[in-house]
Amino acid sequence: DFILEELEEYKEACEKGDIVGILDALCDITYVSLGNGALLHGLKGKVWEAYQEVQASNMSKSCETQEIAEQTVILRAEEKGHPCHWEQVGDRYVVYRSSDNKVMKSINYFAPDLKQFFTDEELRQTTGS
């Protein structure tokens, strides 16, 4: 219920164009989500490190150099059969599928490894193994 309440506040702030309200709602959504996850599921001490792992994974979707972007364009087009193009966004390069501008993963993309934050015993307890 807390998260839904914060989402409603976010929606209202967006509709009003209230940038301070938007920031407040986003912070509250994050706080409620991470705080409840940590407390209700015994994840205290894991959430921040896991968040950083997910952030690093998401950042690996973009390319650090134009050369990597060009290589990604070629590879993704060959793999998927769809033409792709890249654009510079800030100091990064993002590869898009040309037909719908879907972001394509860089050749250097890596999936987040969230299991690293658990001991073998913790994983056994949650999977029932």
Give residue spans per PLM region.
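Flexible "arm" and connector segments at domain edges
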Residues: 1-129
